């Protein structure tokens, strides 16, 4: 009987622990920087949202007036993010960043460079 009570308590703690692990959403909004061959990037406004759920990372980004795009990856060593995202015309953007308490950041590099610190969204 004692064994059943202990197992029940442990199972309850696992359920509570799992329920407390909520995804964390980070965001950045800013303007681009020119890369070789571009000249209009400082006029392009970008919104980037990154959701971290354990080691799973899902991002979405949208340049003002353009369709929303996305990427998925897993956190690397020391919270590193590194992947690529397909944008219009089949072109690619490199996605590089870091999720680290007090020092989270993101960079999209391709037709322009969009880079900045990620801040936690309210409620995350």
Model-derived features: where do they sit?
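Sec/Tat signal peptide C-region and signal peptidase I cleavage site
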Residues: 16-21
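Central antiparallel beta-sheet cores of small beta-barrel/beta-sandwich binding domains
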Residues: 22-124
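Bacterial N-terminal signal peptides that target proteins for export
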Residues: 1-9
